[in-house]
């Protein structure tokens, strides 16, 4: 259990960085929102799941 928490934190950092870079670019590019809407929503879902999983594994006693 000790090794999974740092993995979730690293994945959360990577997904957060990708979303911070990708979402403004997608929204600023004309016509790109219609093509990439599914990717943005999938990224948001993945980010939310990682936040919840990180919190759950942080709260579970070792």
Curated annotation (Swiss-Prot):
Keywords: Chloroplast, Membrane, Photosynthesis, Photosystem II, Plastid, Reaction center, Thylakoid, Transmembrane, Transmembrane helix
Membrane topology: Multi-pass membrane protein
Any single biological process term in GO: photosynthesis
Chief subcellular location: plastid
Entry GO CC: chloroplast thylakoid membrane; photosystem II reaction center
Pfam families from the UniProt entry: Ycf9
InterPro entries hit by this protein: PSII_PsbZ, PSII_PsbZ_sf
Cellular compartments annotated: Plastid, Chloroplast thylakoid membrane
Transmembrane regions listed in the UniProt entry: 8-28, 41-61
Family the entry assigns: Belongs to the PsbZ family.
The protein's role, per its UniProt record: May control the interaction of photosystem II (PSII) cores with the light-harvesting antenna, regulates electron flow through the 2 photosystem reaction centers. PSII is a light-driven water plastoquinone oxidoreductase, using light energy to abstract electrons from H(2)O, generating a proton gradient subsequently used for ATP formation.
PANTHER family xrefs: PHOTOSYSTEM II REACTION CENTER PROTEIN Z
Subunit structure: PSII is composed of 1 copy each of membrane proteins PsbA, PsbB, PsbC, PsbD, PsbE, PsbF, PsbH, PsbI, PsbJ, PsbK, PsbL, PsbM, PsbT, PsbX, PsbY, PsbZ, Psb30/Ycf12, at least 3 peripheral proteins of the oxygen-evolving complex and a large number of cofactors. It forms dimeric complexes.
Protein name: Photosystem II reaction center protein Z
Lineage of origin: Eukaryota, Haptista, Haptophyta, Prymnesiophyceae, Isochrysidales
Gene: psbZ
């Amino acid at each position: 259990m000790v090794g999974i928490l740092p993995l979730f934190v690293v994945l959360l950092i990577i997904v957060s960085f990708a979303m911070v870079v990708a979402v403004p670019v997608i929204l600023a590019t004309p016509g790109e929102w219609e093509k990439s809407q599914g990717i943005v929503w999938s990224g948001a879902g993945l980010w939310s799941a990682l936040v919840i999983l990180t919190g759950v594994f942080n709260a579970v006693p070792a």
